[in-house]
């Protein structure tokens, strides 16, 4: 569901940053903002979200954002839809390089995924949201979840078993024996 504005933003205007010392930050969104972030990411719950680090100069024009992301997320189990709680603790590094050309093709493979072109404004809140999104378990599963498998088949036919699906040519010999011998 697209939004006009992200649920959390903490911008740093690059031109206003001190050129010789790091700018430290400690972002802890409040309950309302955390609820908005959880809704934006499709989470059941989000607690203890914290993004702490610094934005420091690297050379004459480049910048490095280095931070630690901490959060406790609650997602729905992919099997039972029961709540699954996961603790996230991830280091985050982004390097902003002046003069880095934006790739023009629709899909481009970047050699280093932490390198980005230097924008006029570095949004630590957007970096936090991106890092949280990437750190989420893609298929959360409750400890007691048991996936017995799907048993789907056309009407009047028996569903395939695991043995039948792992041995696709198992019935080939029987079919050849039933044949009339003509080739």
Predicted features, each with a name:
Residues 27-29, 51-53, 67-70, 88-96, ...:
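A structural signal for short, well-ordered beta-strand segments
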Residues 39-46, 79-85, 134, 177:
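Short, intrinsically disordered, mixed-charge
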Residues 1-20, 24, 95-183:
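Charge-rich, low-complexity linker and terminal segments
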Residues 64, 68-105:
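Helix-adjacent hinge/juxtasegments
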Residues 28, 32, 68, 72-75, ...:
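Charged, alpha-helix-enriched surfaces in structured cytosolic catalytic cores
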Residues 1-70, 74:
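A positional/architectural concept
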């Amino acid at each position: 569901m697209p939004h006009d504005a992200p649920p959390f933003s903490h911008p740093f205007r690059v031109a206003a940053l001190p050129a010789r010392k790091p700018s430290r930050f400690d972002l802890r969104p409040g309950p309302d903002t955390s609820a908005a972030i959880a809704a934006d990411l499709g989470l059941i719950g989000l607690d203890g979200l914290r993004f702490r680090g610094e934005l420091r100069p690297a050379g004459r024009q480049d910048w490095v954002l280095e931070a630690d992301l901490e959060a406790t997320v609650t997602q729905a189990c992919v099997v039972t839809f029961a709540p699954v709680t996961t603790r996230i603790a991830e280091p985050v590094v982004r390097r902003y390089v002046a003069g880095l050309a934006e790739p023009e093709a629709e899909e481009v493979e970047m050699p280093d995924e932490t390198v980005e072109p230097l924008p006029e404004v570095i949004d630590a809140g957007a970096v936090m949201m991106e890092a949280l999104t990437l750190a989420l378990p893609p298929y959360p599963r409750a400890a007691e979840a048991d996936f017995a498998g799907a048993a789907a088949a056309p009407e009047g036919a028996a569903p395939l078993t695991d043995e039948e699906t792992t041995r696709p040519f198992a019935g080939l010999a029987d079919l050849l024996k039933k044949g009339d011998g003509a080739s």
